[in-house]
From Swiss-Prot:
InterPro entries per UniProt: DNA-dir_RNA_pol_bsu_ext_1_sf (IPR042107), DNA-dir_RNA_pol_su2 (IPR015712), DNA-dir_RNAP_su2_dom (IPR007120), DNA-dir_RNAP_su2_hyb_sf (IPR037033), RNA_pol_bsu_bac (IPR010243), RNA_pol_bsu_CS (IPR007121), RNA_pol_Rpb2_2 (IPR007642), RNA_pol_Rpb2_2_sf (IPR037034)
Organism of this sequence: Dioscorea elephantipes (Elephant's foot yam)
Subunit and partners: In plastids the minimal PEP RNA polymerase catalytic core is composed of four subunits: alpha, beta, beta', and beta''. When a (nuclear-encoded) sigma factor is associated with the core the holoenzyme is formed, which can initiate transcription.
Family listed: Belongs to the RNA polymerase beta chain family.
E.C. numbers: 2.7.7.6
GO BP: DNA-templated transcription
Name of the protein this chain belongs to: DNA-directed RNA polymerase subunit beta
Primary role: DNA-dependent RNA polymerase catalyzes the transcription of DNA into RNA using the four ribonucleoside triphosphates as substrates.
Protein's cellular compartments: Plastid, Chloroplast
Length: 1070
C-alpha cells in the first residue's frame, strides 16, 4: 500500500499484486532453494561425479510474445540454463558446460500463465498450519477427553490423547492407538531419558504394566510393536535393519516432517528452543506436547480454535510452483543417474549436455497446469470475473478438505476473517464457505499468514501510522470498526465507538482504542465492494449479487453506472482490458487495430484487441479513445475495453424501471421489458464460438483438406474457398461445412456401400476410398465467420501437423428466456416483451423499460435496490454520477435516505417536474397504463437502477428434439442438448393427451413415432405403397427395456393377449 501526499491517506493496492508477489518470490527465492537441494550424482563405482553450479543460473527472455503464444497454442515460458560439471575422480579432470534443463512458465501482466495457448491461473489454497493443537471433546459418557494433535507439513496427523485414568495414548493418522512410551522408545528414547525430561514423571511411571515394560525395554522391541500396529500387513515381523529403515522412511521422515512453519509454531506453542533448521519431529517435541496435555487435563492452559486464521496458512502460487520445480528436479536426478550408469556400462564417454533432457520439466509443469485442482482455466466472462478469479481462496485441493466431508463450523464465518476474508463473497451450492475471496487490502505474509492493514492511534503523535497485522497479533488490540468517523473529521474524546477485542465486539470510549480500520471496504472482496448501499441488503442477497456480477456479459454499447462505489475505475485498470499509455507523447496514427504515438523521438505502436473470443465465448475488443494529434500523458486511457467506459467498469445499463405487478407477467421473479431494449440494441451482445479440426497422419496416409467432397450437396459447400476452408465474412447456417476433410480408409470390397458396388460392377466407376470427416456447424451456431486460423505448431510432430480454427460471431438481442439481474441479488427471467406503447409511462410521457415485481423486495430484505433506483433517477435528470462508500450512516442517522431524498428534491426543482419528488409518497410517482391511458390506483416506485444481462442465455439452453440419435443397446433416445437428445413426448405431454382422450394419437406417439422398430419400418412401406398403416402387434422397445430391468431385479413379467374370436387367454413371452 502506497503512502499518499495527504496525511493518513493511502491508495488501494493492485488487485493482482498477490499473484505477482507470489511469482516473484518463486523466481527470486524458490528456484535457488530447490536448486541448492540438487545433490551430487555419482555412478555405482564412484568414478564420475555430476553436479550443478546453481549460483549462476540464467532465465532467458521468451522467444515469442504473449499474443503469438495464444495464437499458435504454445506455452509462454522462459528457458532455464544452469552450468553443470562432470568430474572424473581418477584424473581429477572436469568438463563444464551450460546446459538447458527445462522451460519455466512465466506469469503475464494479468497474473496468469499461458499454457498451450490457454490462459490459466493458480488460485490460493488455505490449509491448516503445521504444529501442535489442543482440543477437548465429549465421549459417549459425557466426559471431556483432551487431545493433542501434531500436524505435519504435508497434512499427516499424530494424536496424543489422555483418558480418564490419566493414561496417554498415541494414534497415527486415526489408526489403532498405542502407548506413548512405545512411540518414544521407537523414536530412540529410553525410559530414563523420558522421565528426566517431563514435568509429571509419576504419570508416566504409573502407566506401564509388565507387558508394556517388555515392549519398551529395548528400542528393537518398541520398533517391532510400532511396526506391527501401523505398517505390518500380516504375520509376526522380525527385527532387522531393513525393517528399521522402512519404518524410518514411512513414518519418521514423511509423517513427522514439520517444516519451517511447523517448527516455528511448535516452538512458540510449547516454549521450546529447538533450532529452526531441525524441521523433523523429535522425542523432545512429543514429551513437551504430552506435558502440556497433562496440564490441560488439570485445567491449566487454553484450548486452540482450529478455525482461527492464526492456525491457517496460505499456500500461494509460489509454494505450488516451487513444489513442482522440486519434483521436476527429482525426476531429472533419477534420469541423470540412470544415464550415467548406462554410459559407464556401455563404455561411453558422457558429457553434461547428453546427460540432461528437458522432458522432466515439460511433463511436470504440463501435468500441473493441466490436471492440478488449483490450476484453473481463467474465467474471462468480463474484467471483474478475471480479477476476482485470481483473488480466490480454496479450502479444497490436495491436503485440504472435500465438499462432502467439510463441516458447517469450517464453512462458517469466523471473527478472525474480519478484514482478511470477505464474509459475503463465496460460492453457492456444495462448496459454500469452502471457496472464498480475499478482502481488497490484504497481503500474504512471509509465513503464509493473511495480514490486514490498520491505523495505529498514538497519543504522542497525532499522525496516523499504518501497520500490517497477522491474525495472531490483532486480537490483543482494541480495534475500532470501520464504521467510525474518518480521520479528518476529528473525534470527540468522550465519544463511544464500536470496537473488536479478542473475537468479541464491544462498545468502548475512543481513548481506549489502539487501532482502527483504514477503509469502509476493508472487510469486502472486489465483487462485494462494487455493490452500492450494501449495508442495506441482506447478506444472502449480497452474496448472490457478487456472484452474478461475475456472470455479466459485455454489451455492444457499454454504459457506466449512475450510482457506484468508487472502485469501478481501479477494477477496470487492474484487469488489463484498457490500453494505457506507458509514457507521455503525441498520437501520430490511430485505427481499430493499433495506436501509434511518438515519445522523445521514439515511435511506439500499441496493438489493440479486435473481436477476440474469451473462454466463455464472450467478445473482447478495444475501442480507441484518443484522436490523432492529441498529446497524452503517462497513465492516460488510450482505448477502452468491451466493458469499460472512460476507464471505469461498465457491466450493464441504466434503464427506467417500475416496481409494480403487470397482469401476472412479472410474478415469481419474472421481468417484463419494453421492445425498445431490443430495437435500439440496449442489451445486444456478441458471442464468438470456436470450431477446430485437426489433420492426422493415419496408417493409410495423411488426411486432406479439400473442397472436393463426394456425395455432399453443393449447397453445403457454398462457403468454402478453393482450399476447402470457409471464407471470411460468410454467413453460416446449421449443418454447413466449415472445413472439408477427407480421411483415407482401406479399400476392401466389404467396406463399400451397396450402391458403390453397383456402380463398380455396371459402369466400372472407381469409387473413392476416402471417408468424409469434414467440420460441420453444430446446432445453434449460425453466424458470421470473423476469423480463420491455419496453425502448424513450431517443431510439431508429423502425427499432428496442422490445426484449423474457425471463429463465428453471433449477434444476440435480448429475448424471452434471458436472465437479467441488478446489483442487489434481484434477478429474473424475461417473460414478455411488450410494445413500447403498451408499457406503463411516466407523467412526462416516457415509457418505462422494465417492470419488476415489488414483492421481490420485502421478503428478501435487499432494500439497497430501492436507494439505488431512486438515486439513479435523480442522477439521470441532473446529469450526475454518484460514487458512494458503504456504511455512510457512520456520519449521521439515515444518511442514505437523506441523500436520496435531497437529490430527488433537487432534480424536481431543476427539471420543474413536481412528480419526481412528491412529499406524500417520496420516491414514488403516479404513472399511467399504456394500453388505456388511465392512471394506476397506487403510486409506483420508479427509478434508474443498473441492470446486467447475464451469461445464462436462452439460446444456449432451449432445445427441442424432432428426430435424432438412439442408443444402440436400449434403442432409447440419447440425453443432452449436444447429442440432439431428449423426448418428443414426455410424461406431462402424455398426461395432456390422456386428458383429451386422443387414444389413437397417443398410440402413434408411443409406438410408430417413437421406439417401435418394426412398426416404424411398416409405416415407411405403407407410406410408399399407399396402403393403410397396420396396427403394431408387439410391445415397443421402452416396454421391453422395462421388462429387462425388472428381470434384473429377479422379477419375471409377462403380458397376455385376449383373442378376439374365442376370448381364449394365450400366454405370450414379452
Amino acid at each position: 500500500m502506497i503512502r499518499d501526499g495527504n496525511e493518513g491517506m493511502y491508495t488501494i493496492p493492485g488487485f493482482n499484486q498477490i499473484q505477482f508477489e507470489g511469482f516473484c518470490r518463486f523466481i527470486n527465492q524458490g528456484l535457488m532453494e530447490e536448486l541448492h537441494k540438487f545433490p551430487k550424482i555419482e555412478d555405482t563405482d564412484q568414478e564420475i561425479e555430476f553436479q550443478l553450479f546453481v549460483e549462476t543460473y540464467q532465465l532467458v527472455e521468451p522467444l515469442i510474445k504473449e499474443r503469438d503464444a495464444v495464437y499458435e497454442s504454445l506455452t509462454y515460458s522462459s528457458e532455464l540454463y544452469v552450468p553443470a560439471g562432470l568430474i572424473w575422480k581418477t584424473s581429477r579432470a572436469m568438463q563444464e558446460q551450460t546446459i538447458f534443463i527445462g522451460n519455466i512458465p512465466l506469469m503475464n501482466s494479468l497474473g496468469t500463465s499461458i499454457i498451450n495457448g490457454i490462459y490459466r491461473i493458480v488460485i490460493n489454497q488455505i490449509l491448516q498450519n503445521p504444529g501442535v493443537y489442543y482440543r477437548s471433546e465429549l465421549d459417549h459418557n459425557g466426559i471431556s477427553v483432551y487431545t493433542s494433535t501434531i500436524i505435519s507439513d504435508w497434512g499427516g496427523r499424530l494424536e496424543l490423547e489422555i483418558d480418564r485414568k490419566a493414561r496417554i495414548w498415541a494414534r497415527v493418522s486415526r489408526k489403532q492407538k498405542i502407548s506413548i512410551l512405545v512411540l518414544l522408545s521407537a523414536m530412540g528414547s529410553n525410559l530414563r531419558e523420558i522421565l528426566d525430561n517431563v514435568c509429571y514423571p509419576e504419570i508416566f511411571l504409573s502407566f506401564p504394566n509388565d507387558k508394556e515394560k517388555k515392549k519398551i525395554g529395548s528400542k528393537e522391541n518398541a520398533i517391532l510393536e510400532f511396526y506391527q500396529q501401523f505398517a505390518c500387513v500380516g504375520g509376526d515381523p522380525v527385527f532387522s535393519e531393513s525393517l528399521c529403515k522402512e519404518l524410518q522412511k514411512k513414518f519418521f521422515q514423511q509423517r513427522c516432517e514439520l517444516g519451517r512453519i511447523g517448527r516455528r509454531n511448535t516452538n512458540q506453542r510449547l516454549n521450546l528452543d529447538i533450532p529452526q533448521k531441525n524441521t523433523f519431529l523429535l522425542p523432545r517435541d512429543v514429551l513437551a506436547a504430552a506435558d502440556h496435555l497433562i496440564r490441560m487435563k488439570f485445567g491449566m492452559g487454553t484450548l486452540d480454535d482450529m478455525n482461527h486464521l492464526k492456525n491457517k496458512r496460505i499456500r500461494s502460487v509460489a509454494d505450488l510452483l516451487q513444489d513442482q520445480f522440486g519434483l521436476a528436479l527429482v525426476r531429472l536426478e533419477n534420469g541423470v543417474r540412470g544415464t550415467i550408469c548406462g554410459a559407464i556400462r556401455h563404455k561411453l564417454i558422457p558429457n553434461p549436455k547428453n546427460l540432461v533432457t528437458s522432458t522432466s520439466f515439460t511433463t511436470t509443469y504440463e501435468s500441473f497446469f493441466g490436471l492440478h485442482p488449483l490450476s484453473q482455466v481463467l474465467d474471462r466472462t468480463n474484467p471483474l470475473t478475471q480479477i476476482a478469479h485470481g483473488r480466490r481462496l480454496s479450502y479444497l485441493g490436495p491436503g485440504g478438505l472435500t465438499g462432502r466431508t467439510a463441516s458447517f463450523r469450517i464453512r462458517d464465518i469466523h471473527p478472525s476473517h474480519y478484514g482478511r476474508i470477505c464474509p459475503i463473497d463465496t460460492s453457492e451450492g456444495i462448496n459454500v464457505g469452502l471457496i472464498g475471496s480475499l478482502a481488497i487490502h490484504v497481503r500474504i505474509g512471509h509465513w503464509g499468514s493473511i495480514e490486514s492493514p490498520f491505523y495505529e492511534i498514538s497519543e504522542r503523535s497525532k499522525k496516523a501510522q499504518m501497520i500490517y497485522l497477522s491474525p495472531s497479533r490483532d486480537e490483543y488490540y482494541m480495534v475500532a470498526a470501520g464504521n467510525s468517523l474518518a480521520l479528518n473529521r476529528g473525534i470527540q474524546e468522550e465519544q463511544v465507538v464500536p470496537a473488536r477485542y479478542r473475537q468479541e465486539f464491544l462498545t468502548i470510549a475512543w481513548e481506549q482504542i489502539h487501532l482502527r480500520s483504514i477503509f469502509p471496504f476493508q472487510y469486502f472482496s472486489i465483487g462485494a465492494s462494487l455493490i452500492p448501499f450494501i449495508e442495506h441488503n441482506d447478506a444472502n442477497r449480497a452474496l448472490m449479487s457478487s456472484n452474478m456480477q461475475r456472470q455479466a456479459v459485455p454489451l455492444s454499447r457499454s454504459e457506466k453506472c449512475i450510482v457506484g462505489t468508487g472502485l469501478e475505475r481501479q477494477t477496470a485498470l487492474d484487469s488489463g482490458v484498457s490500453a494505457i499509455a506507458e509514457r507521455e507523447g503525441k498520437i501520430i496514427y490511430t485505427d481499430t487495430h493499433k495506436i501509434i504515438f511518438s515519445s522523445n523521438g521514439d515511435t511506439m505502436s500499441i496493438p489493440l484487441v479486435m473481436y477476440q473470443r474469451s473462454n466463455k465465448n464472450t467478445c473482447m475488443h478495444q475501442k480507441p479513445q484518443v484522436p490523432r494529434g492529441k498529446c497524452i500523458k503517462k497513465g492516460q486511457i488510450l482505448a477502452d475495453g468491451a466493458t469499460t467506459v472512460g476507464g471505469e467498469l461498465a457491466l450493464g445499463k441504466n434503464v427506467l424501471v417500475a416496481h409494480m405487478p403487470w397482469e401476472g407477467y412479472n410474478s415469481e421473479d419474472a421481468v417484463l421489458i419494453s421492445e425498445r431494449l431490443v430495437y435500439e440494441d440496449i442489451y445486444t451482445s456478441f458471442y464468438i464460438r470456436k470450431y477446430e479440426i485437426q489433420t492426422h497422419v493415419t496408417s493409410q496416409g495423411p488426411e486432406r483438406i479439400t473442397k472436393e467432397i463426394p456425395h455432399l450437396e453443393d449447397h453445403l459447400l457454398r462457403n468454402l474457398d478453393r482450399n476447402g476452408i470457409v471464407m471470411l465474412g460468410s454467413w453460416i447456417e446449421t449443418g454447413d461445412i466449415l472445413v472439408g476433410k477427407l480421411t483415407p480408409q482401406t479399400a476392401t470390397e466389404s467396406s463399400y456401400a451397396p450402391e458403390d458396388r453397383l456402380l463398380r460392377a455396371i459402369l466400372g466407376i472407381q469409387v473413392s476410398t476416402a471417408k468424409e470427416t469434414s467440420l460441420k456447424l453444430s446446432i445453434g451456431g449460425r453466424g458470421r465467420v470473423i476469423d480463420v486460423r491455419w496453425i502448424q505448431k513450431r517443431g510439431g510432430s508429423i502425427y499432428n501437423p496442422e490445426m484449423i480454427r474457425v471463429y463465428i460471431s453471433q449477434k444476440r438481442e435480448i429475448k424471452v428466456g434471458d436472465k437479467v439481474a441488478g446489483r442487489h441479488g434481484n434477478k429474473g427471467i424475461i417473460s414478455k416483451i411488450l410494445p413500447r406503447q403498451d408499457m406503463p409511462y411516466l407523467q412526462d410521457g416516457t415509457p418505462v423499460d422494465m417492470v419488476f415485481n415489488p414483492l421481490g423486495v420485502p421478503s428478501r430484505m435487499n432494500v439497497g435496490q430501492i436507494f439505488e433506483c431512486s438515486l439513479g433517477l435523480a442522477g439521470d435528470l441532473l446529469k450526475r454520477h454518484y460514487r458512494i462508500a458503504p456504511f455512510d450512516e457512520r456520519y449521521e442517522q439515515e444518511a442514505s435516505r437523506k441523500l436520496v431524498f435531497s437529490e430527488l428534491y433537487s432534480a424536481s426543482k431543476q427539471t420543474k417536474n413536481p412528480w419526481v419528488f412528491e412529499p406524500e409518497y417520496p420516491g414514488k410517482s403516479r404513472i399511467f397504463d399504456g394500453r388505456t391511458g388511465d392512471p394506476f390506483e397506487q403510486p409506483v416506485l420508479i427509478g434508474k437502477p443498473y441492470i446486467l444481462k447475464l451469461i445464462h442465455q436462452v439460446d444456449d439452453k432451449i432445445h427441442g428434439r424432432s428426430s435424432g440419435h438412439y442408443a444402440l443397446v436400449t434403442q432409447q433416445p440419447l440425453r443432452g442438448r449436444a447429442k440432439q437428445g431428449g423426448q418428443r413426448v414426455g410424461e406431462m405431454e402424455v398426461w395432456a393427451l390422456e386428458g383429451f382422450g386422443v387414444a389413437h394419437i397417443l398410440q402413434e406417439m408411443l409406438t410408430y413415432k417413437s421406439d417401435h422398430i418394426r412398426a416404424r419400418q411398416e409405416v415407411l412401406g405403407a407410406t410408399i405403397v399407399g396402403g393403410t398403416v397396420p396396427n403394431p402387434e408387439d410391445a415397443p422397445e421402452s416396454f421391453r427395456l422395462l421388462v429387462r430391468e425388472l428381470r434384473s431385479l429377479a422379477l419375471e413379467l409377462n403380458h397376455f393377449l385376449v383373442s378376439e374370436k374365442n376370448f381364449q387367454i394365450n400366454r405370450k413371452e414379452a
